[in-house]
């Protein structure tokens, strides 16, 4: 298949429509030569399969951190016409609104280093983590409906945060289309005890410091400066989101047959966006997204309390404001230019970050001249990046960019090659403290299991789909 792929621009490759009879649009992939050579053939197959779905616009896209996934590849992006297109749970994923939040402080690396172990211990104690972890709060079935409907607004009303937090969250932390009646009792049952917990796998809380500034104006606008300590939170909708996806995958398989949609892969089960089935999934998925935003909000609150406890200063005085919060597993109703015409589309981003350019109405007013903040986390031993969206992303990728480093090794392979103790000791030698619910998670999430984040960030920057603002390096990590 790679023999049919051509390089069409800087760090951009294209899979032609001639590759597969059913392809309606070409597939564009953002890679450099090294990642192109190493990318699995089956990822190209998944990109081609998505290009076969009804109503797809312009391109089937894959970001630099792409790898094999369920239905869409991880790192896959596709926009579908709101009238003729489809919506697919395989284009969102099981962890609905898995996403990343960046919180700033007015502390420096030197302020935090002497108290880092105490701080990590306090965070580890205050934020439940690990497989099957349960949150510290207990909510009723009626209350979970409020969470699913209101998202971050519910958390702020319950005094888990500040009113001003809301403006620096994608969608203001609330998908308005959410309808809790379309979420199964089983999904709610899974979500009830887990609200306010980190979960396991690649989810993490990380204490970082700003190592390098690339764009002084953007950094000043976003409120970051050299040696400043920031917090990164990476988690999603826990078991509730997983159950919503599982419930609707079965539902969508029947819908695809009902509407005579020819699927190149049954994992791409879908329904017309405006059908009863399509609308039900979109509204249930919106509930999962709202749960995830509320989840990150509760965790933010407990991290603020952890800092207050260790530094004997209020979170307000520590200036612990949210820089931004982005979703990277979601489907969104957006407007984009397609062949010079402004169209209503539903953009699927699965392991991809929204990256709206300067001037867009949905960007917070204090950031509108720069572009939307984009947060691209690395792994436990490497840097993370704060970037911003661009007009080029609006033109080429429906305002989308990468979401992280992307896996290079499966969890099973990582466990065979490394032990948790080895990884923990190696990180400690680099001055990075790690706390986790299990040593197995540390091994599974070792730095070697991921692609080079520097490479991914460079491709995004060089191709112009997002631009570097700052580079952060880890000081301490809490893993699920």
Curated annotation (Swiss-Prot):
It comes from the Archaea. GO terms for molecular function: GTP binding; metal ion binding; RNA ligase (ATP) activity; RNA ligase (GTP) activity. Mn(2+) 1 binds at residues 95, 98, 203. It catalyses: a 3'-end 3'-phospho-ribonucleotide-RNA + a 5'-end dephospho-ribonucleoside-RNA + GTP = a ribonucleotidyl-ribonucleotide-RNA + GMP + diphosphate; a 3'-end 2',3'-cyclophospho-ribonucleotide-RNA + a 5'-end dephospho-ribonucleoside-RNA + GTP + H2O = a ribonucleotidyl-ribonucleotide-RNA + GMP + diphosphate + H(+). Pfam families: RtcB. Its EC number is 6.5.1.8. Binds 2 manganese ions per subunit. Transmembrane segments: none annotated. GO terms for biological process: tRNA processing. The active site is at residue 403. The keyword Aminoacyl-tRNA synthetase does not apply. Keywords: GTP-binding, Ligase, Manganese, Metal-binding, Nucleotide-binding, tRNA processing. Its cofactor is Mn(2+). GMP binds at residues 202-206, 328-329, 377-380, 384, 403-406, 479. Mn(2+) 2 binds at residues 98, 234, 328. Essential for tRNA splicing and maturation. Acts by directly joining spliced tRNA halves to mature-sized tRNAs. Joins RNA with 2',3'-cyclic-phosphate or 3'-phosphate ends to RNA with 5'-hydroxy ends. Monomer. Belongs to the RtcB family. PANTHER family: RNA-SPLICING LIGASE RTCB HOMOLOG. Ligation proceeds through 3 nucleotidyl transfer steps, with 2',3'-cyclic phosphate termini being hydrolyzed to 3'-P termini in a step that precedes 3'-P activation with GMP. In the first nucleotidyl transfer step, RtcB reacts with GTP to form a covalent RtcB-histidine-GMP intermediate with release of PPi; in the second step, the GMP moiety is transferred to the RNA 3'-P; in the third step, the 5'-OH from the opposite RNA strand attacks the activated 3'-P to form a 3',5'-phosphodiester bond and release GMP. This is tRNA-splicing ligase RtcB. It comes from Methanococcus maripaludis (strain DSM 14266 / JCM 13030 / NBRC 101832 / S2 / LL). The gene is rtcB.
């Amino acid at each position: 298949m790679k023999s049919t792929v051509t390089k069409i621009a800087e760090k951009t490759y294209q899979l032609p429509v001639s590759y597969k009879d059913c392809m309606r649009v070409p597939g564009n992939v953002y890679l450099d030569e090294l990642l192109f050579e190493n990318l699995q053939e089956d990822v190209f197959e998944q990109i081609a399969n998505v290009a076969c779905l009804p109503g797809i616009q312009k391109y089937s896209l894959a970001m630099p951190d792409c790898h094999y996934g369920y239905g869409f590849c991880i790192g896959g992006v596709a926009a579908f016409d709101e009238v003729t297109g489809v919506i697919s749970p395989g284009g969102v994923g099981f962890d609905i609104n898995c996403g990343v939040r960046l919180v700033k402080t007015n502390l420096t690396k030197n302020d935090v280093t002497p108290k880092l172990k105490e701080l990590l211990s306090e965070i580890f104690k205050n934020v439940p983590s690990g497989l099957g972890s349960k949150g510290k709060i207990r909510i009723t079935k009626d209350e979970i409906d409020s969470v699913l409907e209101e998202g971050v607004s519910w958390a702020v009303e319950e005094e888990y945060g500040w009113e001003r937090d809301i403006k620096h969250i994608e969608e203001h932390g609330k998908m308005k289309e959410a309808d809790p009646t379309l979420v199964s009792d089983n999904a709610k049952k899974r979500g009830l005890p887990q609200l306010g917990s980190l979960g396991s796998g690649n989810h993490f809380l990380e204490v970082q410091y700003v190592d390098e500034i690339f764009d002084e104006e953007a950094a000043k606008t976003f409120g970051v400066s050299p040696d400043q300590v920031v917090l990164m939170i990476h988690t999603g909708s826990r078991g509730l989101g997983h159950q919503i996806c599982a419930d609707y995958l079965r539902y969508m398989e029947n819908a695809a047959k009902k509407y005579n949609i020819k699927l190149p892969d049954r994992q791409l089960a879908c329904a017309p966006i405006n059908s009863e089935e399509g609308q039900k999934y979109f509204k249930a998925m919106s509930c999962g997204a709202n749960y995830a935003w509320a989840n990150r909000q509760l965790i933010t609150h407990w991290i603020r309390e952890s800092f207050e406890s260790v530094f004997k200063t209020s979170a307000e005085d520590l200036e612990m404001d949210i820089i931004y919060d982005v979703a990277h597993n979601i489907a969104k109703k957006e407007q984009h230019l397609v062949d010079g015409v402004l169209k209503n589309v539903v953009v699927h981003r699965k392991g991809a970050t929204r990256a709206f350019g300067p001037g867009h109405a949905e960007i917070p007013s204090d950031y509108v001249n720069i572009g939307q903040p984009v947060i691209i986390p690395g792994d436990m031993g490497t840097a993370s990046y704060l970037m911003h969206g661009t007009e080029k992303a609006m033109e080429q990728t429906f305002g989308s960019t990468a979401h992280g480093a992307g896996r290079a090794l499966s969890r099973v392979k990582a466990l065979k090659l490394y032990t948790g103790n080895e990884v923990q000791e190696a990180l400690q030698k680099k001055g990075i403290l790690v706390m986790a619910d299990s040593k197995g998670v540390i091994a599974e999430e070792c730095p070697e299991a991921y692609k080079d984040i520097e490479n991914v960030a460079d491709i995004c920057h060089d191709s112009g789909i997002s631009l570097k603002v700052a580079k952060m390096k880890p000081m301490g990590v809490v893993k699920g």
